[in-house]
Amino acid sequence: MPQRIIIALVETDAYLGARDKNPFNFQHFNVREICLYKDGMPFPRPMARLDFKNGKVAESYHNFMLALKGSYSRFVPNVTIDEFKEGFTLFVYDMSPDQLGSVNHESLLNRYSNVRLEMKFAEKTPTSITLLAYSERYHLLKIFEDRRVNIDL
């Protein structure tokens, strides 16, 4: 089970390398609802309801800031809520048991779980889009003197 999941949406042309488009322009494409499910249950809370046109995105922005910072990190994303709405839109889910991004609880995480993402859009997307999913996992990597590599999954 990953410690953190980050979801981004980008225009497919930009993702495929169109020279006139920025592949790091992560847009919201008027997502109306987004929910991550862990083993069939909404995680960490019920579905987020968004309204980008009217600026109602505070909950997702708050989750973005908390999940990327955590209480054990000195990293604070330098993204304002206006930037979040205009091209820095990342949906971040902290999957750690304490919801603080802590690596100290690896033993409490289920090794195997089913994760599902549901998204609904307020209107038809203007172009084809690509969903990028990044998961962060903490594993133990051992390299022995005979150059054998062992990864503890």
Listing of model-derived features with the role each one plays in the protein:
Residues 1-153:
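Flexible assembly/topogenesis modules
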